[in-house]
């Protein structure tokens, strides 16, 4: 992704091979997509899901990348894109009765977050999107 003059500047962070199932991580990512970075981190701090911790780390890393590499103001950052892909699956065996064995699949995730710097306005991205649809 190249930053052009007309587009808003973006920063990206990726966490690979995170030991959480992609389905559970997607539930958490759906909570914060489109929100400001500050709101997203506050939501994840109190979310009961275990996947909220690695997602919060990736969002914080993307915000730090934007601040340190692109000199962007952290208060203007919004989680523009966030998605979870499936990583490698660790295969384990659980011994069962009479010599059988069941396969256990320990799934991993690749969590990607792209934050975007928006000009400061009175409404958030989520409110503007809802208002335009009505």
Swiss-Prot record:
Disulfide bonds: none annotated. InterPro entries: Ribosomal_uL22, Ribosomal_uL22_bac/chlpt-type, Ribosomal_uL22_bac/org-type, Ribosomal_uL22_CS, Ribosomal_uL22_sf. GO terms for cellular component: cytosolic large ribosomal subunit. Transmembrane segments: none annotated. CDD domains: Ribosomal_L22 (cd00336). It comes from the Bacteria. One of its GO terms (biological process) is translation. Keywords: Ribonucleoprotein, Ribosomal protein, RNA-binding, rRNA-binding. GO terms for molecular function: rRNA binding; structural constituent of ribosome. PANTHER family: CHLOROPLAST 50S RIBOSOMAL PROTEIN L22-RELATED, LARGE RIBOSOMAL SUBUNIT PROTEIN UL22M. This protein binds specifically to 23S rRNA; its binding is stimulated by other ribosomal proteins, e.g. L4, L17, and L20. It is important during the early stages of 50S assembly. It makes multiple contacts with different domains of the 23S rRNA in the assembled 50S subunit and ribosome. The globular domain of the protein is located near the polypeptide exit tunnel on the outside of the subunit, while an extended beta-hairpin is found that lines the wall of the exit tunnel in the center of the 70S ribosome. Part of the 50S ribosomal subunit. Belongs to the universal ribosomal protein uL22 family. NCBIfam families: rplV_bact (TIGR01044). This is Large ribosomal subunit protein uL22. It comes from Rhodococcus erythropolis (strain PR4 / NBRC 100887).
């Amino acid at each position: 992704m190249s930053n052009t003059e007309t587009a808003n500047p973006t920063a990206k962070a990726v966490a690979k091979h995170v030991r959480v199932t992609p389905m559970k991580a997607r539930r958490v990512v759906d909570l914060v997509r489109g929100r400001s970075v500050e709101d997203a981190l506050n939501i994840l701090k109190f979310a009961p899901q275990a996947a909220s911790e690695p997602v919060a780390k990736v969002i914080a890393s993307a915000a730090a990348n934007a601040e340190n590499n692109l000199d962007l103001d952290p208060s203007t950052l919004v989680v523009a894109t966030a998605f979870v892909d499936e990583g490698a699956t660790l295969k384990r065996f659980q011994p069962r009765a009479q010599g059988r064995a069941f396969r256990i699949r320990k799934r991993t995730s690749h969590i990607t977050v792209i934050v975007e710097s928006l000009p400061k306005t009175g409404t958030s991205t989520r409110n503007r999107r809802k208002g335009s649809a009505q």
